[in-house]
Amino acid sequence: MDLQDNPLIVVSAGIAIVALIFWYVATEIDRRKRNVGTIAIGIVVALCLVAVLPVKEKLKGGIDLVGGSSFIVEIQPGKDEEGNPLPVNEGAIEDAKATLSKRLSKSGLSDNLMQPLGENRLIIEMPGVGPERRDEIRETIQRTARLLLKKVHPNSNQIIAQIEAGTKTLEPGYQVFPIRRTDPETGKVIGMDKILLSRRTIVGGDKVDLARPGDGLGVINVLLSKEGGKRLTNATKTMTIGSDRMAVVLDDEVLIAPTVNATLGRNFIVEGLDGREEVRTVSNALNNPLKYPLNILSERNVTARYGEEVVRQGVTAAIAGLALTLLFVLIYYRFAGFIALIGLSVNMLILFGAMAMFGATFTLPGIAGIILTIGVAVDANVLIYERLREEIAGGKSLINAIRAAYEKAFSAIFDANITTLLTAIILLWRASDQMKGFAITLTIGILSSMFAALLVTRVFFFWGSDTRALKKLSFMNLIPAKTIKFMEMRKPAFMLSSILLIGSLVVMGTKRESSLGIDFLGGSIVNIQLKEGQELSEATVKKAISDLTLEKKPTIQLEQPVGAEGDLISIKYASNDLEKIEKRLRSDIGILGEGQSIVNVQLKEGQELSEATVKKAISDLTLEKNPTIQLEQPVGAEGDLISIKCATNDLEKIEKRLRSDRGILGEINTEKNYDIAFDNETISASLGGEFLKNSFYALGLGLLAVLFYISLRFEFSFAVGAFAALFHDILICIGVVIMCGTELSLIHVGAFLTIAGYSINDTIVVFDRMRESLRSKRGDVAQVMNLAINATLSRTILTSVTTFVAVLVLWIFGGSALKDFSFAIMIGVVVGTYSSIFIAAPVVYIWSKKGSKLRQELIDASLDMPNDLAEPVPSK
């Protein structure tokens, strides 16, 4: 069953799940919690299994992982309402990008990538789209949706007949349009006729507020803007009711031309469309009309941007890393680890099920969101179990210890997840298309993590204790309790961080554009079209240019153009690298070097040169093929011409020898020809200024939301500490990555977003224990903070180590693209762990010393909170 085609089932199940969760939270009776939670888990698991199975059909990868379809479109000059030519202006490319993005999103193709190509072209890449949807997409792209309402000439049929007979010429102010002829019974288009319309337009498509499919077959309901409605009303008032006709023109084709039977307002109906599919496409296009027509120049099937081998390696490495993490949790927490394993499995099932249910695709930034989700999920379980260890060590019974552990861990899990969720939602709202994959997976992942950690695992603990299968719990204890004075280490920590931050800023300042890849700066693209029977792999091309010293790291992609004889190799590179790349490919790859070139030696009057002399001059050269030498006598030339036809790769050797041989007289010129041409074009940055602006804007809004939330839930000094730690982590990570000689690309944007989420999560967990300790313990603030950091130290180390190991496996066994991604995250895990202890907490302490009564403000904040979120304030 495809749940995308059955939204009622999804909505009904969703309402039931939400109701059950509210019931679960509201009830205080453990047995009722257990039963309600079990039903909720059952519905969620069943719904997600239906959504995700069979996996290969339901889960869709992005174009960077699985390939898809690619279109190159060209913007054509448009027409105004009177039919006059409309020149293409500078903003036409951006207008077309925005419009097509909306159209394709409505068609379920939200994860597309669009890049300007030259001055008036666009490359559109769509993930997982095969030949079966190509006709629909072609229509979606090319449909200009130029809607016009025009008055029909009262004697249209008679005048057109006279014009065709040659007895009458076209009247000024009128224009002939094609009109559809439909079958009155089926409504299907069966032919085309002609109709005479006024050149003056009553209302244009720019006045359409909303277009949606109507109730009848081939019908669209259109709602005009207030201005459009006013113009239509004024126009129909001047018409003869019951006699005059008005035509609905779409893209220079008349759909219908009915008689006007009443004065019209903002609403009218468009009829005459050919079935439901055209109704859907046209209504979508009318809501997002193109200012300029688009012409599709080429269509291609494209392979995964990072190559099938890289994707396979990445999936294998990710599974291995996850397996190691789960194995560690299982060994370290024993039976509780087994329950955590169940919770993580449900978490992943919900994530994949929701992605399949809503038709979302997995991109490389999306995988970054999954990695962060796994880290957050493991962290939630570690938080609960470390609390459980404390409660059991304090002498509580098992059932009371479990209850206390979940209650005390709730605030840390809730706050950490909500802050990350705020950032994800704002990214989803404001970020560019390339980052929405990250935001979607992270949003779903955060919600599924909270459900799994706080409900699923607790329900299983209920069943274990109620059935007496769980009588006691034991854990490993590799990290004994410590009393490290972290706050006293703040000065050397600040010095170390200052050195790292200054170093990062210096590296970023000196490297500047040299640290940015083609994704950010743009460059050129060379297309190598192979012929039938010729084979060339991405790996072969990559190997051939691997040792070249290039300005930027090129990306190589294999494509299959529609209608072409053979495959097409597409290489994106820095513009200045073309000569190096072409020379190497021509010399090292046989089929690319094949071709026949000519060396001409033009003699002047009186000069003599024989074929034998030329042959002798080049006889000792090592050539791919024996050249043919021919003496010619061009008409009108002063002297003879020696023509040498040779393999193209031999051209330079022969030319060099002839120029150096003193016995060879005459003027030498060459004609270089290859069997396979290199088609070179300039390409704009895929992560250009608009991308950076949107990303920074979204991140800025996200940070403001997080700071506001932390100020509300904690105190303003905590918000300052969290911001300082996040700024510290991202800046150092960028600096280290650049220092290691890596070019920044889309991959790194996903990695840095993951690091930001990890940093916030890690910091909030430490802050939560500090808040609890400052409310409940007496003594110096620095001393209480030290106790809080020490209390969370085992959790901090365990979470960091498990996350680091999982990403390390990805770095060791993943492909080159995943190595860049995982390396950045490994740096982020180390720096984020360090900053949550040595930067965030000391900043809170220093800020609080500037006059704020930190302990009292936290107590006041807890009294102002809703009862279900506030923790008990200890009596003095």
Q: What do these predicted ranges mean?
A:
Residues 100, 305-325, 341-344, 376, ...:
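Pore- and gate-forming transmembrane helices of large, multi-pass membrane proteins
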Residues 353, 390-500, 813-876:
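Hydrophobic alpha-helical transmembrane segments of membrane transport and translocation systems
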Residues 2-5, 266, 277-324, 579, ...:
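Juxtamembrane "pre-transmembrane" interface segments
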Residues 37-49, 338-359, 370-377, 438-453, ...:
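Small-residue-enriched core segments of transmembrane alpha-helices in multipass membrane transport
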Residues 81-259, 268, 587-620, 689, ...:
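Non-transmembrane, solvent-exposed regions of membrane trafficking/translocation machinery
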Residues 3, 21-36, 221, 225-247, ...:
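Interfacial segments of transmembrane alpha-helices in multi-pass membrane proteins
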Residues 375-416, 460-469, 742-798, 845-859:
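Cytosolic juxtamembrane regions of multi-pass inner-membrane proteins
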Residues 18-31, 37-84, 481-488, 492-534:
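Transmembrane helices with small-residue packing motifs
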